[in-house]
């Protein structure tokens, strides 16, 4: 019976992925477990959740090399007014990598802040609609304004 070592199998997987997925891909995902280290690289996880149940349906490790991260992070934060952190949805350009020791990962090359802004606007509309349906959206408008001590006569 012929057999392969684990390294040989992983090398075969790497070469196959390089041949089948040689391009860059734009993917939509939610950021999870975003952290940077002393070298300036950013390590994170990309997740996708089922919209109905909120259960995870896909997950991948990702990284952003420091030469990209030091440009991408401020660009994203200035464009969106939001921190580059876990829990936000992003549209990123990635390459698929496979390393014999570390396994499958996605390397980030670029980001589209407009996608995140659109998602933030959608979530805001959903929250406002929910508050309106619950009858709490205009509760503060119905209160009489209170004068502060400085304005009392």
List the predicted regions and their residue ranges:
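Acidic, two-metal ion nucleic-acid-processing modules in DNA metabolism proteins
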Residues: 1-153
């Amino acid at each position: 019976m012929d057999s392969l070592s684990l390294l040989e199998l992983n090398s075969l997987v790497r070469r196959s992925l390089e041949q089948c997925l040689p391009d860059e891909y734009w993917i939509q995902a939610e950021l999870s477990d975003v952290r940077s280290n002393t070298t300036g690289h950013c390590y994170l996880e990309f997740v996708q959740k089922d919209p109905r149940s909120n259960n995870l349906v896909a997950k991948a490790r990702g990284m952003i090399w420091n030469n990209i991260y030091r440009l991408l992070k401020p660009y994203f934060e200035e464009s969106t007014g939001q921190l580059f952190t876990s829990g936000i949805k992003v549209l990123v350009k990635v390459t698929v990598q496979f390393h014999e020791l570390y396994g499958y990962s996605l390397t980030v090359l670029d980001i589209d802040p407009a996608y995140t802004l659109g998602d933030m606007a959608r979530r805001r509309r959903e929250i406002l609609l929910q508050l309106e349906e619950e009858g709490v959206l205009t509760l503060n408008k119905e209160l009489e304004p209170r004068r502060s001590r400085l304005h009392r006569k």
